[in-house]
Amino acid sequence: MRFTATAAALVASSIPATLGQHVRDLSNEKWTLSSDALNHTVPGNLPSHAHLDLLKAGVIDDPYHGLNDFNLRWIPESNWTYTTDKIKDLMPIEFCGKYVASTNNQYRQYSFDVSQILEGCNEDPILKIDFGSAPNIVNAIAEDRNSPVWPDGIQQTYEYPNRWFMRKEQSDFGWDWGPAFAPAGPWKPAYIVQLPKAQNIHVLNTDLDIYRKGQINHLPPDQSQPWVVNASIDFVGSLPPNPSMSIEFKDTKSGEILTSKRIGNVTVSGNSVTGVTVLGGVTPKLWWPLGLGDQNLYNITVTVTGHQNQTLAHVTKRTGFRTIFLNQRNITDAQLAQGIAPGANWHFEVNGHEFYAKGSNIIPPDAFWPRVTEARMARLFDAVVAGNQNMLRVWSSGIYLHDFIYDLADERGILLWSEFEFSDALYPVDDAFLDNIAAEVVYNVRRVNHHPSLALWAGGNEIESLMLPTVERKAPEEYAKYVGEYEKLYISLILPLVYQNTRSITYSPSSTTEGYLDVDLSAPVPMVERYHNTTPGSYYGDTDFYNYDSSVSFNSHVYPVGRFANEFGYHSMPSLQTWQQAVDPEDLHFNSTTVMLRNHHYPAGGTFTDNFHNTSLGMGEMTIAVQRYYPIPNKLDSVANFSAWCHATQLFQADMYKSEIQFYRRGSGMPERQLGSLYWQLEDIWQAPSWAGIEYGGRWKVLHYVSRDIYQPIIVSPFWNYTTGDLDLYVTSDLWESAKGKVNLTWLDLSGTPLPHNAGTPGSVPFNVGALNTTKIYSTNIKNLTLPNPKDAILVLSLSGEGHLPNSDKKTTFTHQNHFTPVFPKDLALVDPGLELSYNTKSKTFTVEAKSGVSLYTWLDYPADVVGYFDENAFVLLPGQKKEIGFTVQEDNTDGKWVQGVTVQSLWNQTLEK
């Protein structure tokens, strides 16, 4: 690489479109990868990881195959050098043989002035980046006598220990749903930028904050106030005195210019230039989440000019006008009068409207981020939209999501609850660590602030709800100390930094919290957390809930009653097709060594390769759940039996999530006024047992189909107390206006014959359900029904109603179907439904028909080498009923031949030997 010795900077991170001259993308350069662990070099790439380059060079097999997460540990335990910057891990950087800098935070953007080094460089410049072994580095830090030591039994180690000392993706060190590859490498792009003269700048980052006049993060904005735009640009270089700024908003659909104006109050502070303007006299179209309105977007162009009107910087970002607010305020007298229980709110409001948040938690989609493409994430987010989800909680500790992922969410109306990267651990609070965190927070808050999909900033995952109670239980004498450290990091440090860089987003110190008592931004601890200051009979905060005692999985009395459910779930196995991507044929049985050791629930707690005791507990939980509630597979062919067992675990998982989601959604009309359900978890990081609804590669589990169904706007739900026999039917709606209609109740035996007198229940029940509410439409006790044989009976519930979707004048017809059986599926007197499947080449749809009996959990499956989803799946099909079902192809490597491999089965097939 040859450069002129003018002002030059190494910049590591994504780079915005600006007027910076001579920008060289280092991804286009030739790189080599070397290590003492190898006796030769291999070609490298940027961005990349050592694992990926070694795989491409043929040095290693697929890291995801078999037990390679164990076999390839020599890679993360070695040092690696990329020669010829998002810079990851602790790594010295050399340019022209001269030391440039060391970095210690994967989440920051770094820029370095190398002009003097370049000026003295008499040879072709060589850039060298050394990556130390992350596991070795954190262990060395832990052994330093000056490093903090926490009480025994507090810190959560999954595989590699001491992750909390490094600002690196925490799940790189292992988690209970993923491997511990701890990859090293330049995981984001890097650039060399040359500025040809003084008073010329290059844009590093942009903060565009759009909010209502007078808006404060933790208070509801006044929707009658005009919009305010605060535009701030971070740069390298130097600005001339008294620069000017202007903005232009252009509708991305129509191309119409909303407004174009010069910004007043331009200030320069350090390497940032900022201007603020009020958009008076304009009425932009609002951005709404999925199902609540349109996703109206605008391109905002910010231009910085000098005193002679020459353009110094020019940045265009896509944005939207919306307010999003997490309401944690005390319940008002007006709410009490409506029957809402006392305590405090915990729900989101968009553009002044409270709404029901329906969604899940997203984890890293891959252990190696450089191979996560926009197309791959688009497929995932299309599945989110198809699943009727309007919010994802971006779990920490993965990474702060790339801008292109926020772009995908902006387009699709998916709100992203975002978090700072701290999870299930206590962290250092020394000055150097806090300074590092401060830079990380400021960079990322500013970077993503223009995205209308951004819903919240939370301080971290389960710090308040898990870590502090663990300290209180195991080291009560030190509880006050660690509460103080928690507040120092998450409240005294991070909260003010968020407030200083955005007025449009609420901040919560922890993902699961009881909320706050008071906010005083002038106080040393600006937010007073509620902690244990609660009153019996009152509700506060959000909940997470995991109970692996499957004997109570369908007992709604054990589910937490709260304002918002942000985590809940149970694990299941991926499908046979997904297992076959990573596991050898001889290992395709439920308790093979490979299958068991790829299950990290429960985690090893260290770098053990014989975690059979802990993993057998998790495998046993799935096994016992299936045995309790579903027919036990016993097929003669071992692979077919393995596949049937995998499917059975998915049936249990889906039914359990359905039971909980119905309960939480019903809470919208209960005293708890519950307004959110985000289950754990959306997708997988690799092929293994987990809580995911979408497998690695994109195949939907039963869960994602079932959650899509139960996340529809209006649903009918049965609630059965199997101890007392009480059966209640509810209609729940998340519309913003009342809706009315009827629910048909049809009792049948499993051959499809109607039961006499409809078993003593009415044939239909009318309903009128209020806005964002629920209503009980029928109540009885199973003992009062005239059921000839409870094992040979099913109640089919069919809802039809009318209402208006939010922000729509058009009346819409809503339908939903549910069912109830008076015994659990394993005790049903199943009959062969006689399923037949056909395909129409013209309409490209499948038709499924049940010829001889009720088909429960009707399941269409497709072969490997294609990715997509059916319009409907895991449904009830009655005798003589035909259902036409389409299939959305997201990726096809079969040239259309996959159609020939589509199959259909039902719960009946789980009872067969073949």
From Swiss-Prot:
Annotated glycan sites: 39, 79, 230, 265, 299, 309, 330, 591, 614, 641, 721, 744, 773, 784, 909
Signal sequence, start to end: 1-20
Compartments where found: Secreted
Pathway as given in its UniProt record: Glycan metabolism; N-glycan degradation
GO annotation, biological process: glycoprotein catabolic process; polysaccharide catabolic process
Residues the record marks as active site: 462 (proton donor)
Keywords linked to the UniProt accession: Carbohydrate metabolism, Glycoprotein, Glycosidase, Hydrolase, Polysaccharide degradation, Secreted, Signal
Subunit structure: Homodimer.
Annotated family: Belongs to the glycosyl hydrolase 2 family. Beta-mannosidase A subfamily.
Protein name (database record): Beta-mannosidase A
Organism in which the protein naturally occurs: Aspergillus oryzae (strain ATCC 42149 / RIB 40) (Yellow koji mold)
Primary gene name: mndA
